[in-house]
């Protein structure tokens, strides 16, 4: 993989971006200072942020996919989605409270998450292998929060920023993947009692399981895989909706439960 950053530059950028998250302040996108950064560089920075969190005692509890719309990929001129990691303090219970004082400019997306019962290895992982390896799926609302000024960034910068990961809210109802048609599963997002977004599972690469397969193949490029028991958020079914203190959100999943949270 093509790289342009030295190890010291990777370490410095990881500290810079993570400090923006922890200290709750925005920063210019990193490609302003490093215009020749590559995807390999960006993932090196992301994995170093992960290492920093684990060294601090945080536990990695899942993975997430981003840029999982074919239209969005075409718009950005890329052929694959991106991924990030989730740590323990990102998790919020259904009906719980999200403290916006710890976030910069949060937005929410409706997603379907997979939990695996068998490992998945790339390259060449496909949707059939994912479905066979799935223990259950669970409705999830992701809170994204770019550390970059005005939520404006390029693809390299957002990969380095752990794909804008910050919080996630899981519903209480698990479902067998064989009992659902995830392509046509409908989603209604409400904010303060008003419908703000509608979507269906096919918005995620035609089928959310395709997102998991792509994750396995992306991880294989770094010699990694998806272990059994992994929690994976597959990407936004809806567009991202800004939230602010005082907002109450509910996302209703067809044939499943709803997921709610309050922002303070």
Swiss-Prot record:
It comes from Pseudomonas sp. (strain CF600). Pathway: Aromatic compound metabolism; benzoate degradation via hydroxylation. GO terms for molecular function: 2-oxopent-4-enoate hydratase activity; 4-oxalocrotonate decarboxylase activity. This is 4-oxalocrotonate decarboxylase. GO terms for cellular component: cytoplasm. The keyword Glycoprotein does not apply. It comes from the Bacteria. Keywords: Aromatic hydrocarbons catabolism, Lyase, Plasmid. The keyword Lyase applies. Belongs to the hydratase/decarboxylase family. Gene3D superfamilies: Fumarylacetoacetase-like, C-terminal domain (3.90.850.10). GO terms for biological process: benzoate catabolic process via hydroxylation. SUPFAM superfamilies: FAH. Its EC number is 4.1.1.77. It catalyses: (3E)-2-oxohex-3-enedioate + H(+) = 2-oxopent-4-enoate + CO2.
């Amino acid at each position: 993989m093509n790289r342009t950053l030295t190890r010291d530059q990777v370490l410095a950028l990881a500290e810079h971006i993570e400090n923006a998250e922890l200290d709750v302040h925005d920063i210019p996108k990193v490609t302003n200072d490093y215009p020749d950064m590559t995807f390999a560089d960006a993932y090196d920075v992301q994995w170093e942020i992960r290492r920093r969190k684990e060294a601090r005692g945080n536990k990695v509890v899942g993975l997430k996919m981003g840029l999982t719309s074919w239209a969005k990929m075409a718009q950005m001129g890329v052929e694959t989605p991106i991924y990030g990691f989730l740590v323990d303090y990102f998790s919020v219970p259904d009906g719980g409270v999200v403290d916006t004082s710890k976030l910069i400019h949060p937005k929410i997306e409706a997603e379907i998450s997979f939990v695996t019962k068998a490992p998945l290895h790339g390259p060449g992982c496909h949707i059939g292998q994912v479905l066979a390896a799935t223990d259950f799926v669970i409705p999830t609302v992701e809170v994204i929060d770019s550390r970059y000024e005005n939520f404006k960034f390029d693809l390299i910068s957002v990969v380095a920023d752990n794909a804008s990961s910050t919080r996630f809210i899981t519903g209480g109802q698990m479902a067998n993947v064989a009992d659902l048609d995830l392509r046509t599963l409908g989603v209604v997002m409400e904010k303060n009692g008003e419908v703000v977004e509608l979507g269906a599972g096919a918005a995620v690469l035609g089928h959310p399981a395709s997102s998991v397969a792509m994750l396995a193949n992306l991880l294989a490029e770094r010699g990694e895989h998806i272990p059994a028991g992994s929690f994976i958020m597959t990407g936004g079914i809806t567009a991202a909706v800004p939230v602010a203190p005082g907002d109450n959100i509910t996302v209703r999943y067809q044939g499943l439960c709803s997921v709610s949270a309050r922002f303070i």
